[in-house]
């Protein structure tokens, strides 16, 4: 069974090494870089299962800032993955990676299921030893884990469409809502999980919030400490 991981990058020298390391168990990791000025590409190229596929489409924003087109970048990656005829495509951000338990079980889970999609719970970290539990349990009582998209079967006609400030997932012409209503789904729950490191460095969080506001991409961008809920210590089982 061929498992292909796809990831977008731009100036991710802090994260691309740990990301690629966490997916050594995959057959290929396709890194599509959108114009890094740091060492992202050279770091990624050190991993034997990594393929580099550049992406050049830019969206000009306010104050001379720019970013890569989100859905265009994602669709480019999906097309590159499909060229390899994968059985599964795993898609995530460079700042999100599987914990040790999911890393160890990931291949067996995908090889052993007849599902069309695999969903996993993401723990959103603050620093490196705390997380926001309500982000992983967003329903009103905050009691039930809510997994989100992690992987899909390669043969599916899966793609994305811009819906600023993010994008929609689609299968064919159908917008993908709750996949449990339309497809066979493997829900991966803790202690197996994904660790989202987008907020692991408070100073970088401040810079990211400033970028979104000053670029006009998300003018009302809020700081996670104001909307993500209370903080809990990171559970021992969540370790890498």
Region locations from a protein language model:
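Cell-envelope/extracellular polymer assembly enzymes that use nucleotide-activated donors
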Residues: 2-4
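Short, well-ordered alpha-helix to beta-strand connector turns
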Residues: 26-27, 48, 86, 94, ...
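Conserved beta-strand positions in the Rossmann-like core of class I SAM-dependent methyltransferases
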Residues: 30
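A conserved acidic beta->alpha catalytic loop
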Residues: 33-46, 57, 93-96
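Catalytic-site signature of metal-activated, phosphate-bearing donor transferases
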Residues: 64-79, 97-240
């Amino acid at each position: 069974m061929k498992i292909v991981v796809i990831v977008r990058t731009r100036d991710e020298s802090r994260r691309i090494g740990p990301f690629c390391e966490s997916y050594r168990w995959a057959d290929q990791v396709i890194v599509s870089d959108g114009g890094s000025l740091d060492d992202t590409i050279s770091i990624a190229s050190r991993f034997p299962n990594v393929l580099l596929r550049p992406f050049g489409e830019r969206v000009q924003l306010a104050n001379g800032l720019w970013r890569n087109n989100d859905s265009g970048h994602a669709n480019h990656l999906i097309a590159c993955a499909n060229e390899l005829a994968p059985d599964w495509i795993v898609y995530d951000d460079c700042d999100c990676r599987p914990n040790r338990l999911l890393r160890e079980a990931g291949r067996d889970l995908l090889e052993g299921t007849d599902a069309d999609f695999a969903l996993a719970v993401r723990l959103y970290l603050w620093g490196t030893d705390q997380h926001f539990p309500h982000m992983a349990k967003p329903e009103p009582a905050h009691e039930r884990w809510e997994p989100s998209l992690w992987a899909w079967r390669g043969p599916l006609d899966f793609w994305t469409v811009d819906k600023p400030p993010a994008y929609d997932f689609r299968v064919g012409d159908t917008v993908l809502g709750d996949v449990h209503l339309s497809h066979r789904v493997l829900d991966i729950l803790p202690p197996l999980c994904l660790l989202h490191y987008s907020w692991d460095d408070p100073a970088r969080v401040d810079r990211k919030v400033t970028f979104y506001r000053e670029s006009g991409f998300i003018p009302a961008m809020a700081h996670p400490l104001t909307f993500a809920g209370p903080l809990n210590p990171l559970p021992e089982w969540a370790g890498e």
